[in-house]
């Protein structure tokens, strides 16, 4: 689950061991120095390659190992992989363990049928897609893993129904907004200045001014689903008052700081 990005190494080695048995040359690449990487949560990427019978293009399959937090409202254990009526229920079964499984089974089926092919097959299991990909795809790209002549074609089996092939996606930009106030005892808020109220005023401005403008922007590209044809802004997280790691009862204080994380998605027509 990401954050914090636990079990990356275990996931990478699980897949790597399976591919190694099929003859793939397997390597594990830790993205040291990237956001989130540390000895407790190492950002370990898997890259596996199998050479064909002659020279030719390389087809590379990529899938991300991480999932976002489970959230609430599940009717099944989100990490139990419960099977019911031909469906697997769990966090990440669609985004994107299903795609990873499909890619690996497709490559294995090719080998099991004894089909010879020129060029090479590659697979990468990468980290941190859900938080920007800095330690995953971006790191491997900077190391030259996806560049020619090593790789010619890349297939990313992200979930988008079985009858659609996408050639790109919207741009992303994450940002933070901070408001500040003055701390005081909660019984006498008039002596302080509430940073959360300031953030509320900022949010109201977004609702009144920015969101109507975003709704006017619509791409001419054949984007799916329909709602994704517009520019979007998601208020991703708000933290104020107590420390973010604090899980006890709140203390009676007027919050002197508040932080909001924004997730902005751009259309191809925007710059």
Show the residue positions of the predicted features:
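Short, solvent-exposed loop/turn elements at beta->coil junctions and helix N-caps
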Residues: 31-37, 162, 219-224
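Acidic-enriched catalytic cores of C-N bond-cleaving enzymes acting on peptides and small amides
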Residues: 167, 186-246, 251-253, 267-271
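Acidic/histidine-rich catalytic neighborhood of metal-dependent amide-processing enzymes
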Residues: 88, 96-170, 174
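Short beta-strand-to-loop capping motifs
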Residues: 50, 179-181, 264-266
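Short glycine/serine- and small hydrophobic-enriched flexible loop segments
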Residues: 105-112, 201-207, 264
